[in-house]
């Protein structure tokens, strides 16, 4: 099996290493040629995944069209907002018989599209049955060290999902399958926003009660958007739902939770982003999901509060107060 992994950040590198350790022929694409050269020479990603050695079967490239033509499986591990631009480079390359495994989590700004929708919109030769979303609670820092992790491979095509399951599955990286790609993608996108809210709670010095409320009511928001867009609410009880939500809201590895914590401490978004070496997808997703929720008529008060704090400079303490002072209602509304 020949596999191309697009995106040499921490997660793309981790998955490329995982697959190469299974002795597949893997090529990792880096956007900048000088970065690709450094990775190939140093045999590790010192910028994003320091200390993890590359297996001999993993090679680094910077040319995309030839790589896509060569690969049987394409893993897209670029930031969500860069997915369209990245795949546009192979719009004219035949993709028949190939599987595209997307691991980017987010909603596209401007269009409100999920990642599978972006792929199909930009690649007319691609069928939805060829697309698999690989999501779940899976920090690169732990997977790269072969710590136990479970994820879900989701596609309308059970055959495609099972192929990806077999491809990635190890005794330390357990892969389940699921056919509800809508629910999986919505959950994977919105959980980053809720993690920012959880971090804000930490930054303000609130306790476990507040964190539990944010996670629980955040899950309710995800459920409302999921069902509105055609997903199955039952998916949210799985790895891509509550599993990924909990780990992202609680973990010290979570970049989104970190952004929220710094906001809660009074730093500006510009200051926080400038100090980070990697992207927190929830920042862009908060704007995209807020706009999408208004478009489709779904009430998402936590998402709205995060949007207001990030993009309208609303004080964090005031945003929390406004959430708490909303009209009383049924828990199931």
Curated annotation (Swiss-Prot):
Catalysis performed (reactions): sn-glycerol 3-phosphate + NAD(+) = dihydroxyacetone phosphate + NADH + H(+); sn-glycerol 3-phosphate + NADP(+) = dihydroxyacetone phosphate + NADPH + H(+)
Pathway: Membrane lipid metabolism; glycerophospholipid metabolism
Listed GO CC annotations: cytosol
EC number annotated for this UniProt entry: 1.1.1.94
Binding site for NADPH: 10-11, 31-32, 105, 140, 255, 279, 281
One protein family per Pfam: NAD_Gly3P_dh_C
Active site, UniProt feature: 191
Residue positions binding sn-glycerol 3-phosphate: 105, 136, 138, 191, 244, 254-256
Location relative to the cell: Cytoplasm
Main location group: cytoplasm
EC top class named in words: oxidoreductase
Listed GO biological process terms: carbohydrate metabolic process; glycerol-3-phosphate biosynthetic process; glycerol-3-phosphate catabolic process; glycerophospholipid metabolic process; phospholipid biosynthetic process
InterPro entries to which the protein is assigned, alphabetical: 6-PGluconate_DH-like_C_sf (IPR008927), 6PGD_dom2 (IPR013328), G3P_DH_NAD-dep (IPR006168), G3P_DH_NAD-dep_C (IPR006109), G3P_DH_NAD-dep_N (IPR011128), NAD(P)-bd_dom_sf (IPR036291)
Top-level lineage group: Bacteria
Molecular function GO labels: glycerol-3-phosphate dehydrogenase [NAD(P)+] activity; NAD binding
PROSITE patterns: NAD_G3PDH
Annotated Gene3D superfamilies: N-(1-d-carboxylethyl)-l-norvaline Dehydrogenase, domain 2, NAD(P)-binding Rossmann-like Domain
Keywords assigned: Cytoplasm, Lipid biosynthesis, Lipid metabolism, NAD, NADP, Nucleotide-binding, Oxidoreductase, Phospholipid biosynthesis, Phospholipid metabolism
Family label: Belongs to the NAD-dependent glycerol-3-phosphate dehydrogenase family.
Function field: Catalyzes the reduction of the glycolytic intermediate dihydroxyacetone phosphate (DHAP) to sn-glycerol 3-phosphate (G3P), the key precursor for phospholipid synthesis.
Name assigned to this protein: Glycerol-3-phosphate dehydrogenase [NAD(P)+]
Organism listed in the record: Chlorobium chlorochromatii (strain CaD3)
Gene name linked to the record: gpsA
């Amino acid at each position: 099996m020949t596999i191309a992994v697009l995106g040499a950040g921490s997660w793309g590198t981790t998955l490329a290493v995982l697959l190469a350790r299974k002795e597949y022929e893997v090529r990792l694409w880096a956007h900048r040629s000088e970065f690709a050269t450094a990775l190939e020479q140093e045999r590790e990603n010192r910028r994003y995944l320091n200390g993890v050695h590359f297996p001999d079967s993993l090679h680094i490239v910077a040319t995309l069209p030839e790589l896509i033509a060569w690969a049987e499986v394409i893993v897209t591990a670029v930031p969500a907002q860069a997915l369209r631009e990245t795949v546009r480079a192979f719009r004219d390359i035949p993709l028949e018989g190939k599987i595209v495994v997307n691991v980017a989590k987010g909603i596209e700004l401007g269009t409100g599209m999920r990642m599978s929708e972006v792929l199909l919109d930009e690649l007319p030769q691609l069928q939805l049955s060829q697309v698999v979303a690989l999501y779940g609670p899976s920090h690169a820092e732990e997977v790269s060290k072969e710590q136990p992790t479970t994820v879900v491979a989701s596609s309308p095509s059970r055959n495609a999902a099972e192929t990806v399951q077999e491809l990635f599955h190890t005794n330390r990286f357990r892969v389940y399958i699921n056919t509800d790609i809508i629910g999986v993608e919505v959950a994977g996108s919105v959980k980053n926003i809720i993690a920012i809210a959880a971090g804000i709670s930490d930054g303000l010095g609130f306790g476990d009660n507040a964190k539990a409320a944010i996670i629980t009511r955040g899950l309710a928001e995800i459920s409302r958007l999921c069902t509105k867009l055609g997903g199955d609410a039952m998916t949210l009880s799985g790895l891509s739902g509550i599993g990924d939500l909990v780990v992202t809201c609680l973990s010290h590895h979570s970049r989104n939770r970190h952004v929220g914590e710094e906001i809660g401490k009074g730093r500006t978004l510009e200051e926080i982003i400038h100090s980070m070496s990697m992207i927190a997808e929830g920042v862009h997703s908060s704007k995209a999901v807020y706009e999408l929720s208004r478009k489709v008529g779904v009430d998402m008060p936590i998402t709205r509060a995060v949007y207001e704090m990030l993009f309208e400079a609303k004080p964090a303490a005031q945003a929390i107060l406004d959430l708490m002072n909303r009209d009383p209602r049924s828990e199931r509304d």
